[in-house]
Amino acid sequence: VIVTKSSDNSIKSFEDLKGRKSAQSATSNWGKDAKAAGAQILVVDGLAQSLELIKQGRAEATINDKLAVLDYFKQHPNAGLKIAYDRGDKIPTAFAFLQGEDALITKFNQALEALHQDGTLKQISIEWFGDDITQ
């Protein structure tokens, strides 16, 4: 996702980053995406510093993982920031099991599917991240 100040409506896509200041970790994939879009990169240590630079007006945007951004927004509801663009990237998540634990994996997957079907995962997602990240 691309994050900007809440009041900034000029960035609505990756193309809009061209020539703009984007606060990014130097070696992150998000930084590579910003550079590929033509953004001027302001090197930072991580997401919190990126968002601080945006709030201070020293950067105009940052690209980062939606889950990390939603977590920040949940902890800082009055940050004055918004998700300006969400390209809908899906980053697969997996749970680790020991090899040969097929019965456990089957039970786990069934339980996870039941929680998804009855809406429990959606409720947990909204409670902890303020958005439905189960889709």
Protein language model features and the residues they cover:
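Beta->alpha turn/N-cap motifs
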Residues: 5, 25-29, 46-47, 63-73, ...
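Secondary-structure junction motif
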Residues: 12, 22-37, 66
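Ligand-binding clefts/hinges and TM-proximal coupling segments of bilobed small-molecule sensing domains
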Residues: 29-42, 81-84, 107-135
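Flexible hinge/capping segments at coil-to-helix
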Residues: 4-22
